[in-house]
Amino acid sequence: MDGLGQRVLVIAFDGWNDAGEAASAAVSHLRAAGEYESVFSVDPELYFDYQYTRPQIRMEADGSRELVWPDATLWRPPYRAEGSRLWLLTGVEPARAWQAFAAELVDAALSEDITGIVALGSMMSDVPHTRPISIFSGSDNEQLRTALGVERPTYEGPVGILSVLGAAAEEAGIPTIALWASVPQYVAGYSPSPKATLALIDRLVEISGAEVDRGQLPAEALAWEASIDAAAADDEEMTEYIHQLEAARDTWDSPEASGDAIAQEFEKYLRRGGEGHGKPGRDDPRR
């Protein structure tokens, strides 16, 4: 197997796997950049709790209103004679029947001859907004890890729908990789997070070979970072916290840093009142 192949399905879901809306915004950006057509949607009555995920009223251009139900939809890209193509799967994390939900969507992927899957997720982490957004790239598929040079996940614990879909896809013979962006936890009020969205798309392009127009994302990422800088400038406690995170991140990233130096830096960070749980941006409760 040579990587993901040329018919790649990119997955993101609203909800638990989507801190700062970074993952869902990445798929929305991809869809807006191309002429996609819907090829499959699940029956919302089977999978969603409308008291938890309510239908929405949307205004149309002519002034009429449309009732929109929560869903999960597979989108097909326009035809290209050469190069990788990106199918999209996006929607709301289901409230029930996850195994049936995953089986339906994997069957739809097989009907589209999908050769590989990339699941996008994002999580709140103890990382600074002033540094590059870290992306964890992991796969349970040994051949894919070798081909792409990504890590093997070691997390044990509760998971989201991305993990369930990934396991079902692997069982069906579709190699799957997960990309997780670390979103600074102190910027929860600054969603969406275009810097994290851009980092996910950049990494997706690296591993898939697909061509993606970034559009206004780079400018939006800079504006997002500047808005947080401005907020921190008026908040001494926030500024100090960011400096602590920067020191921890810089120590971790330093090529000459020894294991002891890294441990000492994190001990100092924790003594100052940080609530980190290990490497910055690498502890992922959803992998």
Where are these regions (language model features)?
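N-terminal short beta-loop-beta anion/metal-coordinating cradle
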Residues: 1-91
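Short beta-strand segments
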Residues: 11-12, 90-91, 119-120, 180-182
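Flexible, glycine/proline-enriched loop segments at strand-loop-helix junctions
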Residues: 13-17, 89-98, 148-156, 187-191
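Conserved active-site and cofactor/substrate-binding residues in soluble primary-metabolism enzymes
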Residues: 21-25, 96, 100, 156, ...
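Internal, conserved structured core segments that host functional sites
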Residues: 84, 92-143, 165
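Catalytic cores of processing enzymes, dominated by hydrolases/peptidases
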Residues: 126-207, 211
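A conserved C-terminal secondary-structure "cap"
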Residues: 187-287
